[in-house]
Design a protein with these regions (language model features):
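Structural signature of the two symmetry-related core transmembrane helices
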Residues: 76-90, 173, 275-290
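Helix-loop junctions at membrane interfaces in 12-TM secondary transporters
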Residues: 91-105, 292-303
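Symmetry-related core transmembrane helices of the 12-TM Major Facilitator Superfamily/SLC fold
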Residues: 166-184
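Cytoplasmic helix-loop-helix junction between adjacent transmembrane helices
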Residues: 104-145
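Helix-loop boundary and gating motifs at the non-cytosolic
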Residues: 2-55, 211-249
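Transmembrane alpha-helix termini and helix-breaking/packing motifs in multi-pass membrane transporters
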Residues: 33-38, 149-167
Length: 311
């Protein structure tokens, strides 16, 4: 991938994602352990918190994507979304209770819902047939790098300061500040002849192609029955009796996911996306079946590797 194919604004957005994912992934594998081991929450409470957080992001993405089309600007939503997520990060470190975790996770996912569609639209405005793969590949690479560095930073902090989860929540605010700084360097791109979108998101849905509606319906159904990754982390902790090993398993998953994305993308071009997607769902089922009956720590690595291939 040649650097000349990557516009400066895409590089800036890459650093925004790098630091944001670093902060988010410091906390993602730590939060369920903090909830259960420190605050004494049940698995049901963990699931409810994750459900509230994720459905918040899902409901907001379409609305703010449409709103950014209407106003013809992306950067304001990018600053607002990343800024809100940054402010949410340290809450459980300052107020170590379940309410603070709920507020933090919900605000963080609200920020994600605000920024995701406008950010992707801005990335798309810089892409064409010659560089779209390079642009989105670069951004995904920076995103994944942050997703690996974040949990490793959390592991280092747990090693140096055992069971001091509050410190990790506070420390995650630091990379978030860097991310917000880079958002102020993001500039909107004006495309000659481009018209602002009209109409509501509901009107877009009514006029959307039938195939799009069917696909979105299937994805929605799968999302409702899909389990959060936090339960795999908690199961790994129960089996290994180690916070650090459970988080390392999650890091391993991210590495496999990053390494497998491109080759499986090529396979989907060759054999068809339906076949690869169907195979992925089969692997997903095997992984959860395996975690239900996992007998030994060694199998954590095998199952997380398979889960990375599915993702």
């Amino acid at each position: 991938m040649k650097r000349k194919n990557i516009p400066r604004q895409v590089v800036v957005l890459g650093f925004v994602s790098l630091f944001t994912d670093m902060a988010s992934e410091m906390l993602y594998p730590v939060t369920p352990i903090f909830l259960t081991a420190v605050l004494g929450s049940s698995m049901a409470v963990v699931g409810i918190i994750e459900g509230i957080a994720e459905i918040t992001a899902a409901l907001l993405k379409g609305y703010f994507g449409n709103l950014s089309d209407k106003v013809g600007r992306r950067s304001i939503f990018i600053v607002l979304g990343y800024g809100l997520s940054a402010l949410a990060k340290p809450f459980p470190g300052i107020f170590p209770n379940i309410s603070a975790v709920v507020i933090s996770r919900t605000a963080d996912r609200t920020g994600k819902g605000i920024r995701t569609a406008p950010r992707d639209a801005l990335l798309g405005s810089y892409s064409d047939n010659n560089n779209s793969g390079a642009i989105f590949g670069f951004h995904r690479g920076m995103d994944t790098l942050g997703a690996v560095i974040g949990p490793l930073a959390a592991i280092l902090m747990l090693y140096l300061f055992p069971d001091n989860f509050q410190l990790i929540f506070l420390a995650a605010f630091v990379p978030s500040v860097f991310a917000v700084y880079f958002t102020f360097l993001v500039k909107d791109r004006k495309i000659p002849g481009q018209k602002r979108a009209k109409g509501s998101y509901a009107e877009f849905w009514r006029s959307a192609p039938k195939q799009f509606k069917i696909l979105l319906l299937l994805i929605t159904i799968f999302s409702f029955v899909n389990s959060s990754d936090v339960f795999l982390i908690l199961k790994s902790r129960d089996v290994s009796d180690s916070n650090i090993l459970a988080i390392l398993g999650y890091v391993f998953y991210n590495l496999i996911y990053a390494g497998a994305s491109y080759p499986f993308g090529k396979l989907s071009d060759k054999f068809g996306k339906n076949i690869i997607y169907g195979g992925g769902l089969l692997v997903f089922s095997l992984v959860y079946f395996g975690f239900a009956f996992i007998p030994h720590t060694f199998f954590i690595w095998i199952l997380f590797a398979l889960y990375g291939l599915y993702s």
